A protein has these predicted regions:
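Conserved N-terminal/central alpha/beta ligand/cofactor-binding core
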Residues: 5-7, 40, 46-158, 271-280, ...
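Helix-rich C-terminal "cap"/substrate-channel and partner-interaction subdomain
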Residues: 299-392, 463, 467
Length: 471
């Protein structure tokens, strides 16, 4: 189906068996799963075709259970370990039953993705050390979106681009259609896979106040939560923390919206981070980077002005992926602080105190939790602590970069949207970021958002098709 937009004709031909709101990973997976059982499946994508896919455009890997190494992973990653990792980030799973289901079902995800056209690549090197736990798909997120679209076209799934769903037409506990500026799309079952509300700064401001004005949004500005708001207006129950989000440290010079993965900074474990007062505020070497990189967005969000500065020296400059924009550089710490616009004396004192606190005798190893640590300072640096003493010195200003919000709709194990009265909507299902708060609370694991979207996209699509067929 060709692109649609304001004033364009909507697809006709009577009600669709399943209409999916959103054309990112969760929506595409839901449509593919639904088409196995349903005759007429439609994806309604808000973006035009060149920008379709939402946050999925910016991803590159997925975290799944696997029992042994293969050509795309470097070792086994059993259920118990992934479950332990999930429970160890933030405050643990939102709903243990649904989180356990997600982890268990993840084992079959790579095979399902391969069967629908996805190609894989050998593990990538770099700071995140993900070769054992995560699989990387060839070409990144944009390639994943395009691959699923090609598969959808072969399967006879219709797609309309440039259509914004403003509301759902409801009759009691049933949805009868999707309301758009161009008319009503009738459907027997609906899957909401339209993402969170991270691009809605006014909504973020409800929970974070004026600090939200300093957040950068890693994905598209379309993710404004209007479908989520519509579901709430129709009595959907909430799941997830109001202030919960997946956010990372990004270059403060990044665009306000849609900077994607390229704006993330991976220098943090190899140096120190200071706030606008020139003081350290968190352990930069607390854990391996895949388990801790996602806390740094929140860490920075809680600092004055929502800004912090990553500082490192020449001897570690090649140990992580280079930043998208060139860092500040100077021959002295004071000169670097001046370039960054922070107090020279404070930063120099922080670096001097940090260097003096490093325990002697450690063996630096960026590939594991080494024994290079500080002693007698707060906060400590638990691993990878080396003196910052080799010019030139480098630094970058950082801000919180929000990927997606966790507050969403509560769902059943069949992905049906729950209502505040404890019942479920009969034919409305949810998948992906819009229901991620059932699984995630405050922390995040690299690649697990795609896992949630794929597992719950399959469930939602299959259940929606079954509901449409059985009435």
């Amino acid at each position: 189906m060709g692109q649609a937009g304001a004033g364009a004709s909507l697809p006709g031909g009577g009600p669709w068996d399943v209409a999916v709101i959103g054309g990112g990973n969760a929506g595409l997976v839901a449509a593919l799963a639904a088409r196995r059982q349903a005759g007429r499946v439609l994806i309604v994508e808000r973006a035009q075709a060149p920008m379709r896919g939402g946050n999925t455009r910016h991803i590159r890997n997925i975290r799944c259970v696997h029992r042994q190494a293969d050509e795309f992973t470097t070792g086994s990653y059993p259920f118990a370990e992934l479950w332990r990792d999930l429970c160890g980030v933030g405050t643990g799973p939102g709903n243990e039953r649904l989180a356990e289901l997600t982890v268990r079902e993840s084992e079959t995800v790579p095979g399902w993705m391969s069967a629908h056209g996805v190609k894989w690549q050998p593990p990538l090197a770099g700071t995140l050390h993900l070769g054992r736990t995560n699989r990387f798909f060839l070409g990144g997120g944009k390639a994943l979106v395009n691959t699923y679209h090609r598969t959808a076209e072969r399967m006879g799934i219709a797609v309309c681009h440039g259509i914004t769903v403003e509301d759902l037409a409801m009759a009691g506990d049933r949805c009868t259609g999707l309301l758009t500026a161009d008319g009503v799309i009738r459907a027997r079952a609906v899957v909401a896979a339209s993402g969170g509300f991270e691009a809605n700064i006014a909504w973020l401001r409800r929970y974070w106040g004026d600090a939200a004005d300093n957040y950068l949004i890693r994905g598209p500005r379309d993710n404004d939560g209007r479908v989520l708001a519509a579901l709430y207006a129709h009595g959907a129950a909430r799941a997830g923390e109001e202030r919960g989000f997946h956010a990372v440290a990004v270059d403060a010079r990044s665009p306000r919206f849609d900077g994607g993965i390229a704006t993330r900074l991976d220098s943090i474990p190899f140096g120190i981070v200071v706030n606008s007062a020139g003081r350290r505020f968190y352990d930069e070497g607390e854990e391996i980077w895949p388990k801790r990189y996602a806390i740094w967005g929140r860490n920075i969000a809680e600092q004055p002005g929502q800004i912090a500065y990553s500082i490192w020296d020449a001897k570690v400059a090649r140990l992580f992926l280079p930043p998208m924009y060139a860092p500040a550089q100077a021959g002295s710490i004071s000169g670097l602080a001046a370039s960054l616009g922070i107090d020279e004396r404070a930063v120099a004192a922080t670096v001097t105190g940090f260097n003096a606190a490093i325990s002697p005798g450690g063996t630096f190893d960026p590939g594991r939790l080494d024994d290079c640590a500080t002693a007698g300072i707060s906060p400590p640096k638990s691993h990878w602590a080396q003196p910052i003493d080799t010019p030139p010195y480098y630094g970058i200003a950082m801000r919180p970069g929000i990927t997606f919000t966790y507050l969403g709709v509560a769902v059943t194990p069949q992905a049906r949207v729950m209502r505040t009265d404890g019942t479920a909507l009969r034919n409305v299902f949810a998948a992906g970021e819009i229901m991620s708060g059932n699984i995630l609370s405050t922390g995040y694991l690299a690649g697990f958002g795609l896992t949630i979207g794929t597992v719950w996209g399959r469930i939602a699509g299959a259940e929606a098709a079954r509901g449409a067929r059985d009435g």
